[in-house]
Amino acid sequence: MQTQSLPTDSLPASSALRSVAVDKQDFRDAMARLGSAVNIITTDGPAGRAGFTASAVCSVTDTPPTLLVCLNRSASVYSVFQQNQTLCVNTLCAEHESLSNLFGGKTPMEMRFSAARWSTLVTGCPVLSGAVASFDCHITQVISVGTHDILFCQAAAVIHNDDQHGLAYFDRCYHPLMRQSR
């Protein structure tokens, strides 16, 4: 895994980063209005099995199929993901709200994983049964920004479930996303 910091000295002078006073709480409150899918990110490998809830996940490109996951370097699971170099992004369905809370708290790992059914695909990372979608990935690049690492993850396998409704997080609350009939 290659780690690099965001280069600011290579920006043209006209687009150089300026110091702007943005209140931390105002920023967090505004970001709470940015709705997103709820995901459980899992890993398993030489460093052990771990998982956490994340909404900071998005597509990067489909060639090669790559997405990104943001992970706080102070998170208890950070070193496990860093050492294993593989992960699975499990996008939750509406019925997974309590599972999201388990993986988002201080619950011991064994209790988190015992609350659901899991399988594996290519990397050996836990794949959540009943997830809306699961992306089984290798971590190919890491960029450090502030308190977080941005993990670029290339999908080795993908599955999706057309029978489930999604789960979103908006304004610090869960919201079910209903699939429209086609």
Swiss-Prot record:
Alphabetized SMART domains for the sequence: Flavin_Reduct (SM00903)
Keywords, sorted A to Z: Flavoprotein, FMN, NAD, Oxidoreductase
Gene Ontology molecular function: FMN binding; FMN reductase (NADH) activity; FMN reductase [NAD(P)H] activity; riboflavin reductase (NADPH) activity
Reactions the enzyme catalyzes: FMNH2 + NAD(+) = FMN + NADH + 2 H(+)
Enzyme Commission identifier(s): 1.5.1.42
Any GO BP annotation: nitrogen utilization
Organism superkingdom: Bacteria
Keyword Flavoprotein in record: yes
UniProt function note: Catalyzes the reduction of FMN to FMNH2 which is used to reduce pyrimidine by RutA via the Rut pathway.
PANTHER family documented for this protein: FLAVIN REDUCTASE, FMN REDUCTASE (NADH) RUTF
HAMAP family: RutF
Similarity section: Belongs to the non-flavoprotein flavin reductase family. RutF subfamily.
Protein name, UniProt field: FMN reductase (NADH) RutF
Natural source organism: Yersinia enterocolitica serotype O:8 / biotype 1B (strain NCTC 13174 / 8081)
This protein's encoding gene: rutF
